[in-house]
Amino acid sequence: MALSQYLFGIKGEDIACEYLKNKDFEILERNFHSKFGEIDIIAKKDKILHFIEVKSTQGNYEVAYRLDGKKYNKIIKTIEYYFMKHKSNENFQLDLLCVYKDDIKLLENISY
């Protein structure tokens, strides 16, 4: 991955965190890693853990389509690892936050 792509992704995650904070989410962790993959943001709101995948674009295409089945399965395995590591049984959901040029969309409780 080129440095410019990496920095663009970080900027998208920064924008996502600010958006979530403004919507009363508490940011618990960023870039949680396991051997299976990474979760961009782990946040909490109303006693529910939100595992949030952030996708950003400068183009004119639907960024949500960049979350494919392979990536989805890696995220699910990483969520399972998170619960094993933290010995938690909290309610949770997987969300997709799309950052467009001048728009942000939060798609909650997604499945594939």
Swiss-Prot record:
MF term (GO), any: nucleic acid binding
Cited InterPro entries: Restrct_endonuc-II-like, tRNA_endonuc-like_dom_sf, UPF0102_YraN-like
Superkingdom of the source species: Bacteria
NCBIfam families attached to this UniProt entry: PRK12497.2-4
Family: Belongs to the UPF0102 family.
Protein name per Swiss-Prot or TrEMBL: UPF0102 protein Cla_1413
